[in-house]
């Protein structure tokens, strides 16, 4: 009986040691999630509440003392500086176009690009939005896309704002770099400052006197839209090239009264037939790499 007991105990100890060792094997160890709540947030991931320089606390005179009169003054000015309604910014990329010739004047939409713009216009009409402002890049392909969309939505063409800040370009050197697209540093400097100026012009929380939610439609370009998305969400702007959006797709961003930004659609083109889904220049007519 003693031998049997010793055998059982020895076998049990051996099995326990074996399984303990197996549990220590790196292949079977489960690490804590990198999103563990005890881990401090990296400084770069913190939200900048004054990203548009319109945070109310940054606009009013600071408290000079703790007297009731001064606190009342401060609170009244703070309330007066606060936005009350949200701003919705809907970005549409132009339709497919022909990259023929060196001048923008020859870069017209293809027949497929015109159909894409028509479907997008119908989709925007179905959403039932009452537009407060429509802005279009001054490049031909964006102008043609805008004209087609305007036939579908309730907005007067004469009120469209044509903005050169929205023209296509190289916003910032992408990370990771890509071998097939390497603009000169001077182009990033020239285009980047212009595109950033476009972002600051159109992306900000509502003015305090805005009494209802507003809707702005911007017809522009792939690089510009992707950069705007990264900047608005406070993602590293260098990551813009990792995003892909289709021709005539819809991207919808909302800026709340607090200044927080959320994205509703990113490159939405699911309302189009599959044969109209494109995101690059047609290869058979492309004259540049």
UniProtKB/Swiss-Prot annotation:
Catalysed reaction equations from the record: O-phospho-L-seryl-[protein] + H2O = L-seryl-[protein] + phosphate; O-phospho-L-threonyl-[protein] + H2O = L-threonyl-[protein] + phosphate
Bilayer topology annotation: Single-pass membrane protein
Domain of life: Eukaryota
TM region positions: 7-23
One GO term describing the cellular component: membrane
Hydrolase listed as a keyword: yes
InterPro entries named among the record's database cross-references: His_Pase_superF_clade-1 (IPR013078), His_PPase_superfam (IPR029033), Mito_Ser/Thr_phosphatase (IPR051021)
Gene Ontology MF, one: protein serine/threonine phosphatase activity
Location of this chain's protein in the cell: Mitochondrion outer membrane
Alphabetic keyword roster: Hydrolase, Membrane, Mitochondrion, Mitochondrion outer membrane, Transmembrane, Transmembrane helix
Matches recorded under Gene3D superfamilies: Phosphoglycerate mutase-like (3.40.50.1240)
GO biological process assignments: positive regulation of mitochondrial fission; positive regulation of mitochondrial fusion; protein dephosphorylation; regulation of mitochondrion organization; response to anesthetic; response to heat
Quaternary structure note: Interacts with Pk92B/ASK1.
Function: Displays phosphatase activity for serine/threonine residues, and dephosphorylates and activates Pk92B kinase. Has apparently no phosphoglycerate mutase activity.
Similarity comment: family membership: Belongs to the phosphoglycerate mutase family. BPG-dependent PGAM subfamily.
Name of the protein this chain belongs to: Serine/threonine-protein phosphatase Pgam5, mitochondrial
Record organism: Drosophila melanogaster (Fruit fly)
């Amino acid at each position: 009986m003693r031998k049997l007991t010793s055998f059982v105990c020895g076998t049990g100890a051996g099995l326990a040691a074996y399984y303990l060792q197996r549990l220590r094997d790196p292949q079977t160890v489960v690490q804590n999630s990198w999103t563990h709540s005890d881990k401090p947030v990296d400084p770069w991931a913190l939200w900048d509440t004054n990203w548009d320089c319109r945070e109310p606390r940054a606009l009013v005179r600071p408290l000079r003392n703790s007297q009731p009169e001064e606190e009342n003054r401060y609170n009244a000015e703070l309330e007066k500086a606060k936005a009350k309604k949200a701003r919705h910014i809907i970005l549409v990329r132009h339709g497919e176009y022909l990259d023929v010739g060196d001048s923008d004047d020859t870069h017209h939409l293809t027949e497929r690009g015109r159909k894409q713009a028509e479907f997008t216009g119908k989709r925007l009409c179905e959403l039932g939005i009452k537009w407060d402002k429509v802005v279009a890049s001054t490049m031909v392909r964006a102008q043609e896309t805008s004209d087609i969309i305007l036939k579908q939505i309730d907005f007067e063409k004469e009120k469209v704002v044509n903005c050169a800040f929205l023209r296509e370009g190289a916003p910032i050197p992408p990370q990771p770099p890509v071998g097939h697209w390497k603009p000169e540093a001077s182009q990033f400097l020239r285009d980047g400052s212009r595109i950033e100026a476009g972002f600051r012009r159109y992306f900000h929380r509502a003015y305090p006197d805005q009494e209802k939610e507003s809707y702005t439609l911007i017809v522009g370009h792939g690089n510009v839209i992707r950069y705007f998305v990264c900047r608005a969400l406070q993602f590293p702007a260098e990551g813009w090239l990792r995003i892909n959006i289709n021709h005539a797709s819809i991207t919808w961003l909302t800026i709340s009264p607090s200044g927080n930004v959320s994205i509703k659609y990113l490159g939405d083109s699911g309302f189009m037939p599959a044969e109209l889904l494109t995101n690059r220049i047609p290869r058979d007519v492309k004259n540049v790499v």
